[in-house]
Amino acid sequence: MTFEKYFDHIIEYPILFAIRDNYIEPNGQSFKDFILGNFTNLKDKANLKDFETHLATIFTEVRLKQYIEVRSLDACDWQCLCDGPAFFTGLFYNALDEAYEIVMKWKKENVMNAYLEAPKKGLETELEGKKLYEWGAIFLELATKGLSNRNQINSKGNDETVYLKHVQNVVKNKKNRAQLLLEQY
């Protein structure tokens, strides 16, 4: 998706509310209506704060704010709190081109099918001829390499790859948290 398509999606998305002195209901209007001054319950046009509020009400996997917010890891347990940010840091700062070369070949419908299948099949879900744990290993290797290249050393002499231990275990065991919980019962 290009930035232009993302922006079009965002402004066409129905606005949930606006805030002035109190909450103002939009009656199903889009943010584009608000930008154009066609917001029936408010005479003002939208401002930057309104746009930031609107963005906070859209729950896509990735959101563009003043930073890129990756939301897919917003419900993990204690062990993975550092893994997600470390994983994406390794990819975004040092291996983004390599990761892009992989995913650019994927078909959108196959990704969406895997997205819908994963809650049922876990890491056994197939995507483009590989199981998700296999893709996990590939991207984990890229993230690990990226973090190693950053060479950010802590007071104990370790680089940021120490924060990937939980993800390494998930990929190695080929089971996510839900699968492990199901095995207990």
Provide a role label for each language-model segment.
Residues 1-185:
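C-terminal accessory/tail domains of diverse enzymes
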